[in-house]
Amino acid sequence: MENHSKQTEAPHPGTYMPAGYPPPYPPAAFQGPSDHAAYPIPQAGYQGPPGPYPGPQPGYPVPPGGYAGGGPSGFPVQNQPAYNHPGGPGGTPWMPAPPPPLNCPPGLEYLAQIDQLLVHQQIELLEVLTGFETNNKYEIKNSLGQRVYFAVEDTDCCTRNCCGASRPFTLRILDNLGREVMTLERPLRCSSCCFPCCLQEIEIQAPPGVPVGYVTQTWHPCLPKFTLQNEKKQDVLKVVGPCVVCSCCSDIDFELKSLDEESVVGKISKQWSGFVREAFTDADNFGIQFPLDLDVKMKAVMLGACFLIDFMFFERTGNEEQRSGAWQ
């Protein structure tokens, strides 16, 4: 009878339970409906289900890949994949875009916060080896070495090689997104001081198709002179160069002056690049300095004046043994 009573007290009828059973918790621990077998509540002192496998003890080999080591799951990734920005370690970093000021043409906001530009012409290997004139390319940087713009000449092959440095050209200036923010248009003009009625000129457009200023050559028997004009062709500033536009081992300065030529407010410098580069290539370096508070449109016009000066006095074409002088 005693054995029979123990069997009737077991959780499942007909199951023989040894001495010490039933367990200390009551039968009400079973959860869920009566026809569904559920797990009972664990006894006191139960440590819970086993977690991830612990790490290997000292002296054991490192587990293979895929081994779920100890510690919490979903541990954050420490090294995120890097985005290969066009101006990353493989190239020149771009200047961050500043907030555009009021009444600023799109793309010229970069010029609002700087008072100096560096213009570096790229060396074309085909041009060096064969003398075949290619489209000029320029990097335009700020004083920190960050690229502000990239300029590309857009002139057909026949015009480049037949007209040489006197050629008409279109220069497209791009920002860090590859958008054309400025266009420089130089028409075909006479390059001799003997014809003052047809002197050099370049038009600056920002955005393309909208003129913001002009650079016109002013006739003078000895000095290279230019006038910087606004979009209404009103004179704003002047650029005056040296009598002889050539030197060795030193820079050549074109001073930015007021209209009365009494005060100097900036300059365009053709920088000495070294004997090898000067002798065997036409890749030039220029520095442009202007007042920080100068209107961004006039800063863009000064950039156009730099390119016009480069083509007039420092552009080597074909197999010419020396570059252009002050007057041809």
Curated annotation (Swiss-Prot):
Indicate the quaternary assembly. Answer: Forms homooligomers in the presence of calcium. Interacts with ABL. Interacts with RELT, RELL1 and RELL2. Interacts with OXSR1 in the presence of RELT. Interacts with OCLN, TOP2A and TOP2B. Interacts with TRPC1, TRPC4 and TRPC5. Interacts with ILDR1.
Effect of disrupting the coding gene:
Knockout newborn mice display a reduced granulocyte production. Hematopoietic precursor cell from knockout mice display defective colony formation and impaired differentiation to mature granulocytes as stimulated by SCF/KITL and GCSF/CSF3. Deletion mutant mice start to die at 3 days post-infection after influenza H1N1 challenge, and the survival rate drops to 50% at 28 days post-infection showing lower survival rate than WT mice.
Instruction: PTM Phosphothreonine: list the residues.
Output: T170
Location of the protein in the cell: Cell membrane; Nucleus; Cytoplasm; Cytoplasm, Perinuclear region
Residue numbers covered by motif SH3-binding 2: 56-64
Record-stated family: Belongs to the phospholipid scramblase family.
Residues linked to a lipid group, S-palmitoyl cysteine type: C193, C194, C197, C198
Which stretches are tagged as biased composition: Pro residues? 49-64
User: Which reaction equations make up its catalytic activity?
Assistant: a 1,2-diacyl-sn-glycero-3-phosphocholine(in) = a 1,2-diacyl-sn-glycero-3-phosphocholine(out); a 1,2-diacyl-sn-glycero-3-phosphoethanolamine(in) = a 1,2-diacyl-sn-glycero-3-phosphoethanolamine(out); a 1,2-diacyl-sn-glycero-3-phospho-L-serine(in) = a 1,2-diacyl-sn-glycero-3-phospho-L-serine(out)
Cellular component GO terms held in the UniProt record:
collagen-containing extracellular matrix; cytosol; Golgi apparatus; membrane raft; nucleolus; nucleus; perinuclear region of cytoplasm; plasma membrane
Write out the residue ranges of the motif SH3-binding 1.
18-26
How does the record classify its membrane topology?
Single-pass type II membrane protein; Lipid-anchor
Extracellular-side stretches of the chain, per the record, are: 315-328
| Residue interval(s) of motif Nuclear localization signal | 269-275
Q: Main role?
A: Catalyzes calcium-induced ATP-independent rapid bidirectional and non-specific distribution of phospholipids (lipid scrambling or lipid flip-flop) between the inner and outer leaflet of the plasma membrane resulting in collapse of the phospholipid asymmetry which leads to phosphatidylserine externalization on the cell surface. Mediates calcium-dependent phosphatidylserine externalization and apoptosis in neurons via its association with TRPC5.
Q: Where is this motif: PPxY motif?
A: 22-25
Cofactor annotation: Ca(2+); Mg(2+); Zn(2+)
Please give the organism. Mus musculus
Spell out where the chain crosses the membrane.
298-314
Organ and tissue specificity: Highly expressed in kidney, lung, liver and bone marrow, slightly in spleen, heart and macrophage.
Q: Which GO terms describe its biological process?
A: acute-phase response; cellular response to cytokine stimulus; cellular response to lipopolysaccharide; defense response to virus; intrinsic apoptotic signaling pathway; myeloid cell differentiation; negative regulation of phagocytosis; negative regulation of viral genome replication
InterPro entries per UniProt: Scramblase
The record's induction entry says:
Up-regulated by SCF/KITL and GCSF/CSF3.
List its EC numbers. Answer: 3.1.-.-
UniProt-recorded name of the protein: Phospholipid scramblase 1
